[in-house]
UniProtKB/Swiss-Prot annotation:
One of its GO terms (molecular function) is acetaldehyde dehydrogenase (acetylating) activity. InterPro entries: Acetaldehyde_dehydrogenase (IPR003361), Acetylaldehyde_DH_C (IPR015426), NAD(P)-bd_dom_sf (IPR036291), Semialdehyde_DH_NAD-bd (IPR000534). Belongs to the acetaldehyde dehydrogenase family. It catalyses: acetaldehyde + NAD(+) + CoA = acetyl-CoA + NADH + H(+). This is Acetaldehyde dehydrogenase 2. It comes from Paraburkholderia xenovorans (strain LB400). It comes from the Bacteria. Pfam families: AcetDehyd-dimer, Semialdhyde_dh. Keywords: Aromatic hydrocarbons catabolism, NAD, Oxidoreductase. One of its GO terms (biological process) is catabolic process.
Length: 313
């Protein structure tokens, strides 16, 4: 039997706890070695302890003092953008070659969207999983980009307010900045813009995303087919990811886009929804589910490469 690589999860909140459950249920090459938090009374640490996972409420410093740290090859950071910079530096002081999956908007490593550029980043020591909105929408921008030149990409991510914990709320500015940049760097748009909406509806609604691209005129059927194939690729690790309706197309003439200028061409509108797998969080928290699923997929592919020298299918 192939040995599993041990991973530590930093951040015992919603994302960290959901990730722990996912790894326990679905990890093929990864297993949970430790859960790290800063609140000794957190539900995530208590749950990890009940499940037999080593815990510490003393942050990364506490992790380095755990006996299991010697065996840790992967770290998932589910804290905040500001904390991640400190965490990565401290981890590398003890283990320069440790693999860090950054689930915050810090982006000190390359942006990673598994279905778009995951395989190009398998040797990176730190990868950034962008944001929940980025994981849901950048693949769609990329789907259009592989058919035609995208001059502008804009996304609106609407998430249930109840699914937004303190980390998400503290990182709203970083969310928009990181997602906008990923639309360009990974999605292939010349200019990107991201908007996040915290929907206060009760009962909570599942994550919904709208993607707009302005591109050169191209074969609409080819774009629709590319979008459908990309959606199926994302569904391979986020089963609740789906197109809400058919892709819509409009011709635009001399449209003024702030920061870009006047554009004529094809406007493509893509409507998505993401339902969570409800491993730990409610089904409406698809925004958190897509982050943990993408993070685990990336780590699994890295681990498979480390084990066999090839990328897992």
């Amino acid at each position: 039997m192939t040995r599993k690589f041990k991973a530590a999860i930093i951040g015992s909140g919603n994302i960290g706890t959901d990730l722990m459950i996912k790894i326990m249920r679905h990890g093929r090459h990864i297993e949970v070695g430790a859960m790290v938090g800063i609140d000794p009374a957190s539900d995530g640490l208590a749950r990890a302890s009940r499940l037999g996972v080593g815990t510490t409420h003393e942050g990364v410093e506490g992790l380095t003092r755990l006996p299991i740290f010697e065996e840790i090859d992967f770290v998932f950071d589910a804290t905040s953008a500001g904390a991640h910079v400190h965490n990565d530096a401290l981890l590398r002081k003890y283990k320069p070659g440790i693999r860090v999956i950054d689930l915050t908007p810090a982006a000190i490593g390359p942006y990673c969207i598994p279905v778009v550029n995951g395989k190009q980043n398998l040797d990176a020591l730190n990868v950034n999983m962008v944001t929940c909105g980025g994981q849901a929408t950048v693949p769609m921008v990329a789907a259009v980009s592989r058919v035609t030149q995208v001059h502008y990409g804009e996304i609106v991510a609407s998430i249930a307010s109840k699914s937004a914990g303190p980390g998400t709320r503290a990182n709203i500015d970083e969310f928009t900045e990181t997602t906008s940049k990923a639309i360009e760097v990974v999605g292939g748009a010349s200019k990107g813009k991201a908007i996040i909406v915290l929907n206060p509806a009760d009962p909570p609604l599942i994550m919904r995303d709208t993607v707009y691209t302005l591109s050169d005129v191209a074969d609409e059927a080819a774009i629709a087919d590319s979008v459908a194939r990309m959606a199926a690729d994302v569904q391979s690790y986020v089963p609740g990811y789906r197109l809400k309706q058919t892709v819509q197309f409009d011709r635009v003439e001399n449209l003024n886009v702030p920061g870009v200028g006047r554009i004529s061409g094809l406007k493509t509108s893509i409507f998505l929804e993401v339902e969570g797998a409800a491993h730990y969080l409610p089904a409406y928290a698809g925004n958190l589910d897509i982050m943990t699923s993408a993070g685990l997929r990336t780590a699994e592919q890295m681990a498979a490469r480390m084990t066999a020298g090839t990328v897992a299918a």
